[in-house]
Amino acid sequence: AGAAGERRTGQLLETVASRGPDVLHDLRVPLVDYPVNIDHAVVSGRRVFLIDSKLWRPGLYWALGGATRRGLRPTGRLASRNMHMARDKIAAYLRRRGLPARVQTPIVAVWSSRPDRPVRLAVAGTGLRVRRAGALTRILPRRPADPAITQALARLLYP
C-alpha cells in the first residue's frame, strides 16, 4: 500500500517539476549506519523539501505534539523521528559540500486508501507539515532549482 502512495505522489510531483523545481525520488539518507530512505525531494531555488508519502485509511487523524491518533485510537503512522533525522542529515551533507541550501520542515503527503472517502488531518506540534497529498501543487514553490544542490542530492539516489 505504501508503494502506491509513493507512486501517486511521484506522479503529482512531476507536475510540480514542469513549473521549474527539480524532483528526485527515493534517496538514501547519508551519514547513518542503517538504511533509511526519503521518498521524494523537491529543490526550488536553494530550498530543499523532503517528502514522505503515506497511504492511510479514511478518517480523522490528529495530534497535538504527541502521538498521532485516528479517531480516539493511537496510531504509529507518523514516523517523525526518521523525517527529522533525515532533514538534519541532508542539511549536514549539503553543508559539508559548501552548498547554501535551506532544508525545510519535512512534509508528510497523505493519500486516502479509498478515493471515495477522505482523510482529514489536524496534526500540529510534530515538527512536520502533514498535508493531503493533493495540496503539494499549491504549497511547493515554483523557482528553478539550484543545479549544484540537485547534483549533490542526485548522488544519494538509490540505483
Where are the language model's segments positioned?
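Short glycine-enriched loops at secondary-structure junctions
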Residues: 53-57
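Gly/Thr-rich phosphate-binding beta-strand-loop-beta motif of the actin/hexokinase/Hsp70
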Residues: 50
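Surface-exposed interaction regions that form or flank ligand-binding interfaces
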Residues: 1-36, 45-47, 59-64, 70-159
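Phosphate-centric recognition/catalysis
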Residues: 39
